[in-house]
Amino acid sequence: MPDTSLLPQTTSPLAREMRSFTGLFTEKTFDWDAFPASRGFPDLARAQLRYIGAGGSPKSNDPSTLKAEHFTFSLVNQPVGKFAASHAHEVVEHFMVLQGVLTVGTVWGDEVVEVKLGPKDLLLNKSGRPHGFRNDGVEPVLMQITVGSGTPEMPVHVCHPKNKDLELSRRFGAPGPEKIELFSPESADRRHLELGKHVVRHRDRVPVWEKAGFARMTYVGEGGAPAHGYSMDMIHLPKGVAVRPYVREVEDAYFVLEGALTVGWEQDGEIVERRLGARDLIFNPAGRPHYFRNDGVVDAQFTMVVGSGKPQPVTFEAA
């Protein structure tokens, strides 16, 4: 890895481009009016913070949001006691909890199977499968949401308080408690079997240690939830570990969960770097040589989202 410590501190076109592909958490603002269908319904209150694309919001013209290609990336803050009405997308959508406990209801007609997700747990919602979510906990839920299209259609609501009873909507359309089941991975019921393929528990992830010195845990892709249009790994990067520049045929994005991450781009012999902290993101375009390194005093953890559901021929080499 070239020594960049003595590089001139001028702002080059490449550095400006890299900055334009970076979303810093402290420079962003949660939008409490991101979802028009929630207007006028206090029980549906939630806030969205957009990094890549608009997600389930129609606000695709947000100048602070990076243009999406194969997936969107956003955070959602769900206050205690609030819920999102059951709805369906034409593409897959995942929820990964960062803070709190989220209850997700998956809908089969008038029957609902609920699953609780804790920190670093993920649920991938199938395309066309109605689902909603609710915060029954004692602290706000912060979750990361990715939709498997750069320009997803607006969701289709199945049970919404604008035309259904409020409590019915809170139960995601289940007429009563007898129509609600808690997800069981041991159940032979077809609904539980379907959910079992799409629920990813952090505690069950088995790390795969790469020769480059970091660990990879698959969340979406082979060994995790089925990939449709994108894949996602959680990367554990010990302090002092670095990888050499690599190139993909599609875009990838890093979102820092813990610690600090140094990311570098290369072009025509020029090298530029940015350091990211918790909840910062960088979008690395297809064909761009890029690398990552942990210069911090503690191990770093970040998610890596790749704009293809197919295995990518990338070999990581230690720097």
Q: Which residues fall in each region the model found?
A:
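Short histidine-centered beta-strand/loop micro-motifs
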Residues: N61-K67, F83-H89, T106, E114-V115, ...
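Short acidic-glycine-tyrosine-enriched beta hairpin
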Residues: W108-S127, Q267-A286
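Glycine- and acidic-residue-biased ligand/ion/polar-headgroup-sensing regions
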Residues: P79-V80, E90-W108, K239, E249-Q267
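A short hydrophobic beta-strand segment most commonly corresponding to one strand
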Residues: H94-M96, L123-L124, V138-H157, A253, ...
